[in-house]
Amino acid sequence: MKTVLSKYVKEMRKQYHLTQVELSEKSGVGLRFVRDLEQGKTTLRLDKVNDVLRLFGMEVGPVKMQMEDEG
């Protein structure tokens, strides 16, 4: 299942004119990891996700959630 994160990484990779192999080499993660990330795998190591995102000037961090009113 595609996620916001997987779509973002794929869009940015294409915007930077990188192949999956080039992205994996530049970020220091394996090709399999890049493929899993772009395919929306739900269990990924956060440190490796950040290794990829740093190439685009981003990183994953805590974000305050909006809570829905109950009632």
What is each residue range found by the language model?
Residues 42, 61-71:
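Short, charged recognition helix plus adjacent turn
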Residues 7-22, 26, 51:
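Short basic helix-loop element that most often maps to the first helix and adjoining turn
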Residues 28-42:
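Recognition helix of helix-turn-helix/homeodomain-like DNA-binding domains
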Residues 47-63:
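DNA major-groove recognition helix of helix-turn-helix/homeodomain DNA-binding modules
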Residues 1-4:
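A detector for short, charged/polar N-terminal pre-domain segments
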